[in-house]
Amino acid sequence: MTETGFHLKRRLTSFQIMILGFAGVILLGALVLMLPIAAASRTWTPFHEALFTSTSAVCVTGLVVQDTGSYWSGFGQTVILLLIQVGGLGVITAAVTFLMLSGRNISLKERSAMQDAISAPAVGGIVRLTRFILKGTFLVELVGTLALLPAFCRDYGLRGVWMAIFHSVSA
């Protein structure tokens, strides 16, 4: 016991870390989507609409309150695309990716959380598995983009490039 009578320090389980990670990404996404720069009309988006959109993107459900192509600006669409990507890869996989990109070593606790997140049989090889997941994901998205590119560019010009990328990632 401490002076206050309670000891509040507690270790979070891997499951709790994943839940908090998802909730944090959803909340951050909602706050960014509320900004005027995220809406094509350059007006503030109500919190409940931004939260619904962010939650739907991270949970990759595809439900929307506003039409993505007309309501959101290019910035807002990019935020939604990143939320879809993080949700699709998983918050823990995305976190390990950022750690790898920063050049920082991944701790045993982080490897253990990743093992739980992807149901890996062992902690060993988590970084290699993460690289495999990322390469596979981006390869499939690249093939999808290249397949959609001719039709979208024919119908929408240069805007079709962005549309092909967005549809490939969100599919």
Task: Identify what each model region corresponds to.
Residues 1-171:
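Membrane-proximal intracellular helices of multi-pass ion channels
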